[in-house]
C-alpha cells in the first residue's frame, strides 16, 4: 500500500488553541455535536488534544487543523497541519 493512502486515513480535526505555554506543544479543543436520542437536542461535546507545533507559530485563540501521527510523547499523538484562522 502506498504511503499517501496510509496518510489519508489518519484522523484530521479542526479546533481552537487553548494553551501554547509548553515548548513546541499546543493544546487544541475540538467540539463535536450529537443529537440526544430522546429529546433530539444537539449536545456539544469537547475534547482536548495535545499537538506538536514545531515552530511555535500557533497562539491562543487560533483555529487550527491537526492530524494524527505516531506517538511523540506520553500524551501527544497529533501534529499541527495548518493554521486556518489567526486570532486577533
Curated annotation (Swiss-Prot):
Pfam family for this entry, one: Ribosomal_S17
Gene expressing this chain: rpsQ
UniProt record similarity statement: Belongs to the universal ribosomal protein uS17 family.
Protein origin, superkingdom: Bacteria
Subunit details: Part of the 30S ribosomal subunit.
Gene3D superfamilies according to UniProt: Nucleic acid-binding proteins (2.40.50.140)
Organism, scientific name: Lactobacillus helveticus (strain DPC 4571)
Biological-process GO terms, alphabetical: translation
GO cellular-component term (any): cytosolic small ribosomal subunit
Entry keyword set: Ribonucleoprotein, Ribosomal protein, RNA-binding, rRNA-binding
The protein's name: Small ribosomal subunit protein uS17
